[in-house]
Amino acid sequence: MVVADPAADLLRLVTQHGDPPPSEASRADARTAELIRRRFGTSLPPPFAGLPGDDEPIRVATAHDAVAIAAIKWRAFGANYRGGVLADDFLDARDIVPPVSFWIGRAMLPPSRRHRLLVWGRPGVAFGYLDAGPVHLDDVDPSQPESGEVYELYVDPMAQGRGGGARLLETAEDWFRDVGYERVELSTLVTNPAAQGFYRRQGWEPTGRIIPVDLGVVAFEEMRFARRLRGDGS
């Protein structure tokens, strides 16, 4: 079998069936995905990664995880953002954004020591990821001290409800403390009460700020959450 572009070929296997994201792969697709993993060292996302074990680690991402990260985000959108969270016509036409090259760069050369990309899963597989760093300049609240931000946290639909998201968030909070942040923020969609409930359970609270976002192809509002980090790990 000839694999001309391992990233594109693996993403084609992930996206070809549309939504809802399948929880099983055909034998032919599974063989192709495993071939890509063996030949190129590419980490596999679900459904090719199977289900996470109880001892799956949280680790710093490498370039080998980039395709899996892109795939997890695409699959999570299709599972979590239907039903009015985002417009169906946008979801029907969505692409891989950002591209795999973005995640390769993020893993290989972080913008600063205050940026970190984490994945949930042993080397060779990924079930979720978290991207973190300083608060984006457009989102800085001048009334607050310098803060860190969780830019993105996605867990694959197959792996949700198994504690990986909470562990990613806890690991990120420990790292934020280590690099000197006492306060962290993140955004959720106003139309996504499930995500808001998750963050509340992890100790995050709304700041009261609502930020309108217009990407041209889709517009929505984001709700800002924040949490103060104390030195005792709470």
Q: Which role does the model predict for each range below?
A:
Residues 52-55, 126, 144, 219:
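A short, polar/charged loop/turn motif at coil->beta-strand junctions and beta-hairpin connectors
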